[in-house]
Every structure is written in C-alpha cells, then in structure tokens.
Amino acid sequence: MNYRDLFVGLDVQVPLLDGRQVTYVNLDNAASTPSLRHVADCVQNFLGYYSSVHRGMGFKSQVSTHAYEQARLATLQFVGADPRDHICIFGKNATEAINRLSRRFPFTDDKNIILVSMMEHHSNDLPWRAVGRVVHVHLTPDGCLDEEDFDKKLARHAGRIAMVAISGASNVTGYVNPIHRLAEKAHKAGAQIMV
C-alpha cells in the first residue's frame, strides 16, 4: 500500500518564483495536516445534509445535530471516557481548544500552578499564563523533555499543580514525549494533564 494515496492534495503543483511548477512538499503538518481521502469523501457525502447544529427543527438541522452528537460519543469512546461523567467539546483548532480549556478549568487559589514544557508552541503556553502560575519544565541539550526536571518540579510544587500542559510531540524537533508515563506522574501528584 502506498500511504500517499490515502491523502488529498499531495501531488498539487505549485509555482516557483522562476515560473517552474513543482510538486508541493508539505512541511506544515503541525498547523494543517493534509486531509485523508476517506475524511474528504465523508464530508462530501454529508454536505447535502449540512445545516445548523442545535439551532433548528428542520430535517437537515436534525440530521446535522444527530451527526454532531454521534461524533462526540465516538470521540469519548475512543479515549475511554464515560459520557455520563465526561463531555467532549470541539474546537476549530488546538489554539482555540487550549484557550477554551484554560478559561474554563477550575483553578483554585491553592491549586493554580500549570507545568508547561519549554518545547511548547505559544498556543500551549500563553493561555495558561493568563489564568495561573506557569512553571516551565526544561529540556535536555538535545531538545528532549528533561524528565528529571519534570519530577523535581512535581515534587517542589506538590499539591499545588492543577495542570500539566505538554505536547505529544515537538513540532520543531519531532521528539515524542513519554505521555503515558508523564500522565501517571501527573495524576499521582493530583494534577490533570492536557496533551
């Protein structure tokens, strides 16, 4: 199987300054990953029914609302969350979602520290500064998360850390964080983790 066949737009020709046309190379996956063909097909098939969600009684609005709610349930099931105890809130992109979470998270005066790694994009750093006290976790000289520093800061601020905000992978180096291990440590310290 050729994995390139699974995506839309990988063979798009773009102009260079000298007038030549070349195949586009996408180096911006952190912001806008190419769509999967299957997803594009599903969107195309649904467009005839597309309407406002939770805002109308017409047939198309009811179909759109049902599809939206089914997507929420599917997302909760995918992450193993019980819909009786959790809710899925969609955002346009990671920046909007992180801003929403930062403004709605129940920080308290006693528990308002957010651990943020130094590898984070501003969209996962700046929103937290507006709502609590950000403590940055350092990186190793080769750009990896300094897990020893992470552990020290968890211990130093024990009981006061509300949130750990960390990327699954660096959009600069490609380093993949040990998320499961970090989540276990965060939860053991009484903090939530946002990946």
Regions found by a protein language model. Name each.
Residues 1-195:
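Pyridoxal 5′-phosphate
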